[in-house]
Amino acid sequence: MKLLRLKITDPDGFRSLSCDFEHHFRTELSLQDELAQANDFAPFVCAGPNGSGKSNLLEALAAIFFQLEVLRVRRSFLPEALQDEAPDVSPVAFELDYLIRVPAEYRSPDSPPWAKVGVWKKAGESVRIQWENQADFSTDVYQAFKGGHADILLPQYVLGYSSGENEILSLPFFKMRFVQFDEYLNALTQQLSYPGHPETRLAYLDSGFSQAILLCNLLFQDEATLQAFREDVGIEALREFRIILRHRIPLDTVQLEAFDLADEDQKRERRNRIQAEARTRGLTESEISQSVDDWVRREIIKGNPALSETDEPGSTRYRLNLLQLLDGDEKSSLVVSALKRCATLSYIDDAGDALVLDYWVNEETRQAFRENFDGSALVLFQAFQVLLTLNLYAVSETLKTDLYTSTSHYVSETVPTLASDQRIMRFKFVRFTKQGVAEPMMLKELSDGEHQLLHSLGLCLLFRETNSLFLLDEPETHFNPDWRANFISRLRQCLPGNGEFAQEMLITTHTPFLISDSKPEKVLVFAKDEATGAVSVEPPGFNTFGASINKITMSKVFGKHETIGGHAEALLDEMRTRFEKGDENKDALISEIDRKLGDSIEKVLLIKAILDSDQPGTGEALD
C-alpha cells in the first residue's frame, strides 16, 4: 500500500486537523522512485513538538478505515448500532487517495501491479470508494464499492499500536474488537459455522496481545527471521507455556432467552403446546403457571448445543459454552481441537471448568503447530485473537451499544477487567531462554523496553506477508539510545520487502535517531500555529538521512537550539553573566566551569570566549 493524499473536508475538522487540511504523502517523482525499488521498505516518520498534530494524522487514517471496514462487513454481520447507512462518525467528510497491490488473479499480463483507489465521504452520506484505473485490469465493468472488489481495494489489515494510552487512536479499533466478539456470539446464537479467524481487518494490538505475538513468532519463525529479536533482547529459545481455556460462563434468564430463535407466533404456539402437555399429565393450572417459564427455557436449551443447565438454584443456573463453535473431535480443524493436538499434556480442571493445555517446546512441538495451523504464524495468531476476544463476554449489551456510538476518549475505562480465573483464555508460564541468564525466564520478567521492542518487531514479523497499513504511535518510548538508533534497521529486517506484498507504515516519534535513519521525503515535520491552531506538515528542509542527532534536534524538526539540559543551561548562563561583568578572575572562572559542567559545545564556546577576551582587539562580551 502507498498513501498518496489525505484531505479533511469535515466542517468541524478532525481533532487538531482543521477543515481543508490536506497532505500529499508523495510527489510524483518520489512515487516513481519507490515503485522502481519495490523491495526497499521505509516508514513515514512523523515528528514535531507535543501537541503539533502528528498523532492526529494516524487517528484520522484509523477513523477513515473504520468507516470503510463497517461498509465492508455490512455484507456479512454488523451490530445493529452500526447499521446506519451514513453513521455520524468523525470525520464526517474527507478524501483519501492511495495505491494498493492487486492480487495476481485480477491482473492480466499487461495490467499494472497497483490499483489506484479514491475514497471520499460527504457529510450526511455514506463513504464511497472508487477503483480509478479499473479499466487496466481483468475485472467486470467499472464500478464503485461492490462485490469482492471491496476486499482487494482495502488493505488486508490496518494495525494500530501505541506505547502509551492513545485512546483516540485505539477507539475505532476497540469498536471493531467488539464487532468481532458480537460476530462470534451471533454465530453461536444462530448455530452458524465460524471461520476461526477474525472477519474484521482492523486490529489494535496492545499489551494484551504481547504473549500471543511472542509465542507465534518463536514457534514459527526461522533463525534468520528471528535475528531482530536475538540481536537486541537476546531471546533464544521458547521452553514452555500453558494455555487455559474456560468452557462455560453463567447466564441469567434474560441472557438465556436471547438465544431463543423463535418468532412471536412460534413462541406463543410453543407455550400453548407445553401447557397442553402439562394438562395431559394431570398438573393443575397453578402448577403449570409456576413451571411453564422453566419448561420454555429447557426447550431453548435443547435447541442449542452451547447451552446447558446446572443443578444450582437461582436464576444463574444456566450455562453457555463459549468455545462450542471452536471445539470438535480429535480430527477436527477447529481451533481448540488443533491446540489440543499440539499440546504435550492436556487435562480438564473440574474445579474451574477449564481445559488446561501444557506445551514443553521442542522441534516436534513446532512441527505440530506448523501442521495444524497451515505453517503460518499469522494463522495461529488469529486463532489466539479469536480466543482472547471472548474475554469480552462480561460487557453488557447496553455498554456495547454505548461503545459503538461513543466518541469518548475514555471508553476503554468503562470495560470491566476480568480476574484471571474468569477469563475464557489466558496464557501462563511462558518461559524462554535468554542470553546471559542461567535459568529460563518469563515474559513478565523483561523490562518495559524489552517488552516494547519484542511487541513492535513481533507485530511486523507476523504481518510481513500482507498488504497492510501500520499505525505506530511512539513505539520506542522505553528504548535505550542504542535501540532507538537501530529501530529503523530492525523494522527493515522484519519487513524486507517482497514483490507481492507492500506495507505502509507511519510512526510518530520524538526520537531524532529515527529521523537520522530516514530519507527526507519520508520525514513529516508537524507544526501548529499558536494563533490559529492550524496544523501544517512540511518536509524537513535538509537531508535527514545520516544527519547527526544535534543537527536534527536543533533544526525545525524539534526546534531545540541547545544541546544541554535546561538546568545546566541556566548555570552556564549565570557564569556567562559573571564573565561579562568583568569582575571575575578568568582562570578561576574557567576552572569552575570545567569542574561543574560536562563537555558540550556550549561549554567550549564560553571558555573560548573567555580565553579570546585576552587577545588584542576582542571584547569581553559575547554576542
Predicted regions mapped to residue ranges:
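Conserved P-loop NTP-binding catalytic core
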Residues: L58-S126
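Glycine-rich phosphate-binding loops of NTPases
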Residues: R107-G164, L169-L188
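P-loop NTPase catalytic cores that bind/hydrolyze ATP
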Residues: Q156-Y157, S163-I168, P195-R242, R248-P250, ...
